[in-house]
């Protein structure tokens, strides 16, 4: 039995799905930024790998304790990155050492860590799906994803194009040209502003699968 947050509330069902990448043996951390969608990410990772990831809230684990993980997923969350416990310090510490995938607040934190800014929107997005456009095809996140796709949005902040960090690259935008996804040019860091774990993002699980498969490929060979 599992329960997912399906945009209109929690729905529980029996899981009979086998894992997609059942040969993967990884230690995956989901850093929970106190968001109701975090456990959708958890269940996606379980479906993909056949194993539950570790989940810690951003004030329940130390930065040092993260060092032995093979991949880090930064969950969505309320507020701004500076209010999210060890979120930004985790990115600073493990950038270039452990593959990182950020969702919503996670993208905003990555932007700030590398010297960028976030800006407050005049119109808040809450539980709506809008069209996204991939503008960089050779990314981990969007491998085998259509150039345009629908994705769920729950946010009032975005990464600003003003003073956008040279180290980062915009990989997807919305219809207004706002930043909807990015990656680091050198490190294994990618992030999305939308919610891949929402039922309103049909290709979302594939995006997370892409990240996990890539992170697994970066593990040192025994």
Language-model segments: residues:
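Catalytic beta-strand/loop cores that center a nucleophilic Ser/Cys/Thr
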Residues: 138-186
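Cysteine-nucleophile active-site neighborhood
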Residues: 69-139, 144, 150, 208-210
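Short hydrophobic targeting helices and cationic amphipathic motifs
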Residues: 4-6
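C-terminal and late-domain segments of enzyme folds
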Residues: 169-173, 177-222
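N-terminal beta1-alpha1 cap of cysteine-dependent amidohydrolase-like domains
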Residues: 9-14, 19-96, 105, 202-222
């Amino acid at each position: 039995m599992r329960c997912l947050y399906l945009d209109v509330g929690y729905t529980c069902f029996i899981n009979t799905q086998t894992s997609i990448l059942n040969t993967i043996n990884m230690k995956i951390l989901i850093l929970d930024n106190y968001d109701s969608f975090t456990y959708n990410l958890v269940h996606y990772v379980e479906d993909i790998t056949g194993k539950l990831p570790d989940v810690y809230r951003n004030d329940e684990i130390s930065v040092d304790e993260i060092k032995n993980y093979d991949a880090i997923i930064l969950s969505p969350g309320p507020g701004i990155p500076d209010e999210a416990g060890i979120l930004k310090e985790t990115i600073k510490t493990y950038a270039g050492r452990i593959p990182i995938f950020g969702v919503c607040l996670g993208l905003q934190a990555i932007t700030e860590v590398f010297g960028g800014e976030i800006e407050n929107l005049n119109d808040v997005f809450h539980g709506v799906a809008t069209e996204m456009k991939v503008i960089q095809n050779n990314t981990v996140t969007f491998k085998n994803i259509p150039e345009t796709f629908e994705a769920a949005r729950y946010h009032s902040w975005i990464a600003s194009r003003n003073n956008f960090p040279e180290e980062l690259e915009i990989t997807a935008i919305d219809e207004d040209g706002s930043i909807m996804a990015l990656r680091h040019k050198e490190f294994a860091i990618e992030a999305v502003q939308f919610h891949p774990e929402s039922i309103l993002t049909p290709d979302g699980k594939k995006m997370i699968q892409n990240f996990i498969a890539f992170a697994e490929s970066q593990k040192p060979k025994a």
